[in-house]
Amino acid sequence: MSKLRFFQSLLISTVICFFLPSINARGGHSDHIHPGDGNYSFHGIVRHLFAQEEPTPSLELTRGYMTNDDLEKAMKDFTKRCSKISRLYSIGKSVNGFPLWVIEISDRPGEIEAEPAFKYIGNVHGDEPVGRELLLRLANWICDNYKKDPLAQMIVENVHLHIMPSLNPDGFSIRKRNNANNVDLNRDFPDQFFPFNDDLNLRQPETKAIMTWLRDIRFTASATLHGGALVANFPWDGTEDKRKYYYACPDDETFRFLARIYSKSHRNMSLSKEFEEGITNGASWYPIYGGMQDWNYIYGGCFELTLEISDNKWPKASELSTIWDYNRKSMLNLVASLVKTGVHGRIFSLDKGKPLPGLVVVKGINYTVKAHQTYADYHRLLVPGQKYEVTASSPGYKSKTTTVWLGENAVTADFILIPETSSRGNQLRSSCDCSCKSCGQPLLTQFFTETNNGITLTLFVVVVFLCFLLQRRVRFNLWKQRQSSRRSITV
């Protein structure tokens, strides 16, 4: 009977595998850093190049730009016009009480899905307003084209895109870099090298709103839009000794890849004579501390770029259409990169068949990606054209490792983890009495030579049949994913 119970256990495990939740982690068309840990903070150290006081833009120059009220109305009008693929929400308020509005674009806005999330933030500095104008144009372009343009459709169906045109509405209203408390918001985040000011309550309301936002939503990647140069900037932004030199983060290759996506899609960013390929490591350009970019990567688990998208901080409004034309393709391709490449998947427990929030690491890269709490989906951005050893783990379960060759298209790698002490293992042990001479025989041989042959054979046939159905299901999923050029692996 103990052997019969073993096969019953085997049958149950197979059924669980067969009926695993059918939600796929979408994100693809064919000491260790643990993001989210720690609570360091700091008050900013001046980044000399753009932190210098500059003349306030004239009132004449601001004509043609949306006021804060204009922007709010435009965002509300947008979500009414495009209600099927968008929603409007606020993550908090500025010092002067203006809502920090965000537009979410997705085929299922407001719902939790096993998809990567991307955020764009504009107007971090009040006197750099181009981003707020371009981000609203981006939202409208996607709304107008997602039914007819493949790239727009890909983004709507496979990504949750969050667009915040203005993080610093107070600074914009007075045409100044800093917020209403005269604090540079891009120097107000926790920093890995200078953890001064550990009191969260001493941070600016805009900063706290961003930090809370990233606790609520697990973003895969992000970009902030700035003005005053033409370059895609990536981590690290600072160095431990405050000197200026190239200081690479663990995912340096991936960040360079993402930065090149933007610069090479841009009309002329990659042609820069100052920055090779139109990209730069922040610390090699000029170090800053307390920046949003590094904080996103360390504490938020989010790959963020700082995009300088116009040589002039506050160009004439008549130039906005040209700047939009130069940046539109770059902005779209950067978001689409989340689903075009990388390794994506979900983690399950074998014993219960449920999503298992865990950790994913890649050998040789000192960085950990966390799977989402709800669907246990993960989205690991990596450079195409390389082989990676990917490991999934979760407390109380045996880790699993697989080798992935990442070509030009994304790969799905789902992991099914076995408990450290599984019920099946206990049944195996209980079925073997050390005083029994036959314990050395193969288990299946024992079954087929004892009196339970008929029942055992029936169970065996059922298990084989379910495995056959499971293989067909996997092949069908692979066929569907191949239609979008995505490979799939189950480990």
Swiss-Prot record:
User: What are the EC numbers?
Assistant: 3.4.17.-
- Bilayer-crossing residues are 453-470
Task: Give glycosylation sites per the record.
Answer: N39, N268
- Extracellular topological domain: 26-452
Q: Which residues take part in binding Zn(2+)?
A: H125, E128, H226
Active-site residues, record numbering mapped to chain: E308
Membrane topology, record value: Single-pass type I membrane protein
Q: What GO terms in the biological process aspect are recorded for it? A: proteolysis
Q: What does this protein do?
A: Possesses in vitro carboxypeptidase activity against the C-terminal arginine and lysine residues. Involved in the maturation of CLE19. Removes the C-terminal arginine residue of CLE19 proprotein. The cleavage of the C-terminal arginine residue is necessary for CLE19 activity in vivo. Is not involved in generating active CLV3. Is not involved in CLE19 or CLV3 perception.
- Tell me the protein's name: Carboxypeptidase SOL1
**Native organism:** Arabidopsis thaliana (Mouse-ear cress)
The UniProt gene name for this protein comes to: SOL1
